[in-house]
Amino acid sequence: CLLILGLVLEQLQVEGKSCCRSTLGRNCYNLCRARGAQKLCAGVCRCKISSGLSCPKGFPKLALESNSDEPDTIEYCNLGCRSSVCDYMVNAAADDEEMKLYVENCADACVSFCNGDAGLPSLDAY
């Protein structure tokens, strides 16, 4: 779980910058990149890939409109992350204690990921 989120975050930093019009587009792109190709995810989520230092006009990287659906979007991102990544870890755990630890750390990573916290501490710490 944490490795997957770490790889997604690392890909976002190494590859071209993804520029999205909204938080919904940003979350869509981030979740899609867990399995999808950069160009595919950008197209599906209506984002653009920029190799420059800034995003094209109309595609702010993480800017939100004042009346955006940010809380709902973040909640859906958290639910999607937890159900697709953290639930998988339940089956991988050897015992109840290990499962509890995995799920707790995974849930924390999902919250940070969905809130756009690019300054995550090293995921190896989990």
Swiss-Prot record:
GO terms for molecular function: toxin activity. Disulfide bonds join C19-C55, C20-C47, C28-C45, C32-C41. Keywords: Disulfide bond, Plant defense, Secreted, Signal, Toxin. One of its GO terms (cellular component) is extracellular region. InterPro entries: Thionin, Thionin-like_sf. It is found in: Secreted. Transmembrane segments: none annotated. Pfam families: Thionin (PF00321). GO terms for biological process: defense response. Thionins are small plant proteins which are toxic to animal cells. They seem to exert their toxic effect at the level of the cell membrane. Their precise function is not known. This is Alpha-1-purothionin. It comes from Triticum aestivum. The gene is THI1.1.
